Amino acid sequence: MDPSKYRPSSAYDTPFLTTNAGGPVYNNVSSLTVGPRGPVLLEDYYLIEKLATFDREKIPERVVHARGASAKGFFEVTHDISHLTCADFLRAPGAQTPVICRFSTVVHERGSPESIRDIRGFGVKFYNRGGNFDLVGNNVPVFFNRDAKSFPDTIRALKPNPKSHIQEDWRTLDFFSFLPESLHTFAFFYDDVCLPTDYRHMEGFGVHAYQLINKEGKAHYVKFHWKPTCGVKCMSEEEAIRVGGTNHSHATKDLYDSIAAGNYPEWKLFIQTMDPEDVDKFDFDPLDVTKTWPEDLLPLIPVGRLVLNRNIDNFFAENEQLAFNPGHIVPGIYYSEDKLLQTRIFAYADTQRHRIGPNYMQLPVNAPKCGHHNNHRDGAMNMTHRDEEVDYFPSRFDPCRPAEQYPIPACVLNGRRTNCVIPKENNSKQAGERYRSWESDRQDRYINKWVESLSDPRVTHEIRSIWISYLSQADKSCGQKVASRLTVKPTM
């Protein structure tokens, strides 16, 4: 008998109940007892198995992006960019690749309302012929901090107070007052875009700069942009409160119902590219994750479309156990030197091993749909059937060999060991440009949100003054309006 043929699956359900070992269960209502009253006998094996399974049916929730929903579909290339990359799934117009996509809130817990103000996660897993590519992004193009040493503190400052488990503005504003680089992300976080109407009506961004490499080995830095074909729609604070009070899973329901009705969500993929030789021509560091690239100088290039046309079959198997990792790239795409990206390559795989187990890549939703081979073996919950005798490399008894070399960036890196910030911080310019691009009513909502947060009674005069100074450096009128509402003068 093929040992993998009858692995647990609904495809092999029997018409009657069984234990996990396949033994028949003739009573699933009453426990085995001594007489009608009891006590209950420990020999009721199915009762013990049922309770023990129930006790363990949940896995640790994600430390970030815990609240989310997934859907399946395809990505189709619509424009030729083969001169920029040799990535197989981008090889030519018409090429299609199966995908699974997960949307989420970032800070809040599993089961929390999806209408709460938060950045939204936008992760896409491409099941390519040459391996999985995970584009793990958000609905805003920047992040709060550029160095991963601050990342755990960033998340803790955004999450609830560890003493009371209450989310409080004073904690957030206290921490980020030490990180002026966060101001640009706050220009999104306190803006309308962090109250999206649902997942279908929001943009997505790869956030980090990556690199595209063509078959000649020429590299370009790249940023990825997802644009919804149905447009961007956001809620007001009042609408968000109403929606969240009516249905805490409104965005999940909207995504599921839309696909079930044949109204398939669709996004267009665009990229921005930059020649590495041009990196030093800007007044900011293009590899700084707190910055966007100017579209007037680096215009959006159309690439393809993402269509979600299938709902997931099982929420636990295809959402809770779904694992993304920015380290999963394919030939033709490579990492940039972005400090935060470099550390996410490790951190994502590490958290999945903790959350799901060391063999999480064997789960069907995470496993590549192409052939794959290495000597990673065994471990808890190993599900592969392997009968080879050679589990080392190299060997004259095993014909397996290294893959052919594919192009990677050939840049020369040098410098001293150092712990320092980047030279071109320029923390306020882009935040100010974004603020000035809005209509007056949108500016007013942004100012109102700052006033509300800075009015937290535990926010000190010093912290208020620092933030008003940051806002004034971005846009003088913005800082003045917030200051006048709070009767505070900048001190920086």
Curated annotation (Swiss-Prot):
A Pfam family of this chain: Catalase-rel
Active-site residues from the entry: H65, N138
GO cellular component: cytoplasm; glyoxysome; peroxisome; plasma membrane
EC class: oxidoreductase
rRNA-binding in keyword set: no
Cofactor(s), by name: heme
Residues binding heme, per UniProt: Y348
Record bears the keyword rRNA-binding: no
Protein name: Catalase isozyme 1
Molecular function per GO: catalase activity; heme binding; metal ion binding
Protein family: Belongs to the catalase family.
Database matches in Gene3D superfamilies: Catalase core domain
E.C. numbers: 1.11.1.6
Catalytic activity: 2 H2O2 = O2 + 2 H2O
Taxonomic source organism: Solanum tuberosum (Potato)
Entry-linked InterPro entries: Catalase, Catalase_AS, Catalase_clade1/3, Catalase_core, Catalase_haem_BS, Catalase_immune_responsive, Catalase_sf
Subcellular compartments: Peroxisome; Glyoxysome
GO biological process, one term: hydrogen peroxide catabolic process
Its job: Occurs in almost all aerobically respiring organisms and serves to protect cells from the toxic effects of hydrogen peroxide.
Assembly and interaction partners: Homotetramer.
